[in-house]
Curated annotation (Swiss-Prot):
Protein family (similarity comment): Belongs to the microviridae F protein family.
Record localization: Virion
Function per UniProt: Assembles to form an icosahedral capsid with a T=1 symmetry, about 30 nm in diameter, and consisting of 60 capsid proteins F. Upon virus binding to host cell, one of the spikes dissociates from the capsid and the virus interacts with LPS through the exposed EF loops on the F proteins. After the genome had been ejected, the channel formed by the F proteins at the unique fivefold axis remains open.
Gene: F
Protein name: Capsid protein F
Pfam families membership: Phage_F
Organism: Escherichia phage G4
């Protein structure tokens, strides 16, 4: 009888590791990733602290930090190629990598350094894009389809792709193709009442899909069903942690006179993924994004910018609010000196559902606060996404970019795998 080992017990493996990461405001950065195997039981307890780089001014507003863990099966990345790869076994053709740009930081958005020939596995690059396209991009914008990291802008592959601002009336508008009117063709002298009802029903289902059901899984949920992450070919969100980074306010940095002050932000956190059974080979990626609220120095309430107020503007009449179509407004009605030609659409009465932040005039003359100062872009997508460069001026030093994180990933995986001793003692 052969003494060749053909199987292994399911034993725990400690995959704990340290991560020292740095990133920029509003960009989605991979903190860590772990390859997993079919049959694994994966659990993670991430503990650490996030710090903002030294601020030029005292701490004015907290920043929000979001941490996510996703599971992406390799089959979602490689498709039939992966199925054939596993069926062919040792005779399978190798899985080709993707190519990065020059520099050891050309794959930093993936939480890794590229190989000596500037290559990374495709499952990392495409897995990141799948996460962004399914969970972070504006629903009405096109998917990211970079074939290689080398096709990405340098700021994106170094610091991650920009995500949307936190919600406000001007950063979360309706889709650009939203209709503000709908016509129905009728006879010259009569109106088909039944046809009118049918037209209302058609309009309702079209609006539901335009605003709230942009993805197939949303439509199935509306019908009372659901689609699995596998059937929908999307990354599975295992855990999300959200917190506000506040820390402490200011430090005196001049020992002799304490005449110089700078803001300090430090926040400890814990991100825990409960035990997850891995159904097939894949990767678990943990990503983070840090954002300030979209406070703008020049923002005003719509009732100020509109100037000539109608009954519909100010009355907040429930009958009108519930039945009027979406309203097209201009940036000029929200920001002093903005062009009137820059239009976007909001729900009727939205100015009564939100309240703008206010920044007093003396702040405008000072740099160093986490506020938007330049007028918002006239391009809708640029306005929705965080303007990362806006925050460069608020930091005294960017040696560790905008924020830095020191964490330990306490990871335990139960895996069918021989022990190190068994692997050494072959046959």
């Amino acid at each position: 009888m052969s003494n060749v080992q053909t199987s292994a017990d399911r034993v725990p493996h400690d995959l704990s590791h340290l991560v020292f990461e740095a990133g920029k405001i509003g960009r989605l950065k991979t903190i860590s990733w772990t390859p997993v195997v079919a049959g694994d039981s994966f659990e993670c307890d991430m503990v650490g602290a996030i710090r903002l780089s030294p601020l030029r001014r005292g701490l004015a507003v907290d920043s929000r930090v979001d941490i996510f863990s996703f599971y992406i099966p390799h089959r979602h990345i490689y498709g039939q190629q992966w199925i054939n790869f596993m069926k062919d076994g040792v005779n399978a053709s190798p899985l080709p990598p993707v190519t990065c740009s020059s520099g050891w930081d050309s794959a930093a958005y993936l939480g890794t350094i590229p190989s000596s020939t500037l290559k990374v596995p495709k499952f990392l690059h495409q897995g990141y894009l799948n996460i962004y396209n399914n969970y972070f991009k504006p629903p009405w914008s096109d998917d990211l389809t970079y074939a290689n990291p080398s096709n990405m802008p340098s700021e994106d592959y170094k610091w991650g792709v920009r995500v949307a601002n936190l919600k406000s009336i001007w950063t979360a508008p309706l889709p650009p193709d939203t209709r503000t009117s709908e016509n129905m063709t009728t006879g010259t002298s009569t109106i088909d009442i039944m046809g009118l009802q049918a037209a209302y029903a058609k309009l309702h289902t079209e609006q539901e899909r335009d605003y709230f059901m942009t993805r197939y899984r949303d439509i199935m949920k509306e019908f009372g069903g659901h689609t699995s992450y596998d059937g929908d070919n999307r990354p599975l969100l295992l855990m999300r942690s959200e917190f506000w980074a506040s820390g402490y306010d200011v430090d005196g940095t001049d020992q002799s006179s304490l005449g110089q002050f700078s803001g300090r932000v430090q926040q400890t956190f814990n991100h825990k993924v409960p035990r997850f059974y891995v159904p097939e080979h894949g990767v678990i990626m943990t990503l983070a994004v840090t954002r300030f609220p979209p406070t703008h120095e020049m923002e005003m309430h719509y009732l100020v910018g509109k100037e000539n107020l109608t009954y519909t503007d100010i009355a907040c009449d429930p009958a009108l609010m519930a039945n009027l179509p979406p309203r097209e407004v201009s940036l000029k009605e929200f920001f002093h000196s903005s062009p009137d030609s820059a239009k976007f659409k909001i729900a009727e009465g939205q100015w009564y559902r939100t309240q703008p932040d206010r920044v007093a005039f003396p702040y405008n003359a000072l740099d160093g606060f986490p506020f938007y100062s330049a007028l918002p872009s006239t391009e809708l997508k640029d306005r929705v996404l965080v303007n990362t460069n806006n925050y460069d001026e608020i930091f005294q030093s960017m040696q560790l970019a905008h924020w830095n994180m020191q964490t330990k990933f306490n990871i335990n995986v139960y895996r069918h795998m021989p022990t190190t001793r068994d692997s050494i003692m072959t046959s």
